[in-house]
Amino acid sequence: MQEGSKVTVRSPAGSGEAAVAFARRRWALLAAATAVFGGLYLRIFTAPPPAGFASPKAAPSAVSSAKAFYRPQLLPNSTARSVHSATAVEISGGRLRAFWFGGSREGASDVAIYPSVFSPPERTWSPERVLVTRESVQRTLQRYVRKLGNPAVGRDRSGRLWLFFVSVSVGGWAGSAVNLMVSEDEGETWSPPRRLVASPFFNISTLVKGPPLQFADGTIGLPVYHEMAGKFGELLRLDGEGHAIRKTRLSWGQSSLQPVIVPRSETDAVGFMRYAGDPPNRILVVRTSDAGAHWSAPVKMELPNPNAAIGSVLLSDGSLLLVFNNAPENREDLSLAISKDFGNTWRIAHRFEGDPGSPRAQVSEYSYPWIMQDQAADIHVLYTWGRSRIKHAHFNTAWLEGRR
């Protein structure tokens, strides 16, 4: 080498300018992720509390039929071998539109969401059809979907139907997410499903079962629950586009699931939850007096709960109804209880299933009730009948008066 000649020293791969550029990109990505997750955290956990629950519905203008009736019926046979977890909403003409999931078994890859419509004058349900499949959700979300689960339907203030349902991409139900579809034509057509962001971190382990509710400002309250690293309930508040803006804990620990929330005024509501802990097995109850901003600690009721879902509705006359499995260890007895003091005391009014002389399903399980009152003041209960059929009990307040 000649004296004074120029020597170029090259930096090893991964060092120097390349390393600096890589580090800058890494920090930029980290900052972006922090901003996104931080924004989601602030949006979900720091939104102001709502002004109040939407005012409870007024008494229907048409009083429930004077002649008492109670009409139970099984929905038409499903093409799915196993069906479960019905939900329903009233649509135009006094009809009901119901949804449930069905497949070869719960959790199977062939499970789909099925709808059907009930016509009160004809007392008939339409043939089911497939609305949502694992494959259709997977295509729309552009992510792997392993299975589908519970649906829950409700209305927003503008009259649109909101259909929530559970999907799982990895693992069991603890790895669930909640999806939303919206209909502006009473359920004839639906928007593509969209995955709700219910948590800023990973966004998994959120499930739904109970009916959505309305707040006075037009936002939606969605009772949800979690099964990963605990079993507890929450109230998720969504804006008019279905984005989470606030989340409030209903319970803590390892033993509470599937909350059902029933408001009775702009500030007061009661919530019931499935109990999955140590005996004694009892329904859990929580209460709020500030429109869901804070909730009392869960307390066990006197009514039993064999680790099973519950249904509840406040009637237009102020009575509170509860549908539940009236046994601590199994789902063979499905009963109706009524309270005149907003859940402080209860009386059993009827047994839907469990009488020795009543027809029995091959699998003695009667579970996952959904109860609602329509604009004619009639009451509807849908539930899983032996995991093979959905059953519908339709009755009026005159029949209920005879059971009080």
Segments the model singles out, each with a brief description of its role:
Residues E3, V9-R404:
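Asp-box/BNR beta-propeller blade signature and adjacent active/binding-site loops
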